[in-house]
């Protein structure tokens, strides 16, 4: 068998001349082979270091991304726990209800708090489960909710009392206006009003005829005074003389006489 041979330049220090001598693979020592392999691996590592490093992104399962905003008053912490909060109706601040292992438990806690604050008007995540037995809220949260409900009831009572006082003031003003009406209109019953209206509707003609008779009697009894237009006034007016002014019209007779002469 023929063995492959490689030629490596071997320096000749004695004469100062480089000579290429044939060197076979079988003549390499194990140390030289190991050194060559290390050089090749080093080149591969330098080439791989030049490329950008791959960063593994955080795996987001579709369940977490969907349930993040699925329930009302529930949000997720970055470490995975679920938090329930509710907005108070008056000052619009958030009341913390606690942290829970699942989103459903947090949603049920929100439903309990919302039902205590708003009653049947509340918008719930699970309206069918509100009357069933649920896990109670923490004691601190429950006491806060009860105090808030009491304050809301007090404000509602104050508002209702103020509305009643307004209505009473309106009624009192209407009663005072009735005092200015005549007594006959205040104390007459409805039947008398109807009878008086019927009588007034039945006898309008008799009243009109009586008024005409009275006016005719007054006219006949009173002295008749007429304007006296005598002729003396017209005679006095006719006695005044008017000044004679020269006529503006052309005298054609005088012009014809002058032309003939």
UniProtKB/Swiss-Prot annotation:
Keywords: Activator, DNA-binding, Ethylene signaling pathway, Nucleus, Transcription, Transcription regulation. InterPro entries: AP2/ERF_dom, AP2/ERF_dom_sf, DNA-bd_dom_sf, ERF/AP2-like. GO terms for molecular function: DNA-binding transcription factor activity; transcription cis-regulatory region binding. Residues 70-127 bind DNA. Its main location: nucleus. It is found in: Nucleus. Residues 195-224 are annotated as: Disordered. One of its GO terms (biological process) is ethylene-activated signaling pathway. It comes from the Eukaryota. Gene3D superfamilies: AP2/ERF domain. One of its GO terms (cellular component) is nucleus. Belongs to the AP2/ERF transcription factor family. ERF subfamily. Probably acts as a transcriptional activator. Binds to the GCC-box pathogenesis-related promoter element. May be involved in the regulation of gene expression by stress factors and by components of stress signal transduction pathways. This is Ethylene-responsive transcription factor ERF056. The lineage of its organism: Eukaryota, Viridiplantae, Streptophyta, Embryophyta, Tracheophyta. The gene is ERF056.
